[in-house]
Amino acid sequence: MAVPKRRTSKRRKRARNTHKVAPAIVIQSCPQCSAAKRPHRVCAECGYYAGEQRVAAQEA
């Protein structure tokens, strides 16, 4: 059975794992109501997407 000859250092381990990090969440402002929203998704506040109302706005 294969066994490592030397212990893996923190630097080598962290350099290998740098590609496993989760991407940062991108947030844009809605052009209709200026609320924060994710790109390519319907705005949760006003229900608009690409200049058209796709979903009825939720009343608070």
Curated annotation (Swiss-Prot):
Protein's name in the database: Large ribosomal subunit protein bL32
Molecular function as annotated in GO: structural constituent of ribosome
Classification of source organism: Bacteria, Pseudomonadati, Gemmatimonadota, Gemmatimonadia, Gemmatimonadales
Region named Disordered: 1-20
Highest taxon in the source lineage: Bacteria
Pfam families, A to Z: Ribosomal_L32p
Record field: compositional bias (Basic residues): 1-19
Primary gene name: rpmF
The entry's keywords: Ribonucleoprotein, Ribosomal protein
Gene Ontology CC entries for this record: large ribosomal subunit
A single GO BP: translation
Signal peptide positions on this chain: none
Keyword Ribonucleoprotein: yes
Protein family (similarity comment): Belongs to the bacterial ribosomal protein bL32 family.
Keyword DNA repair among record annotations: no
Coiled coil: none
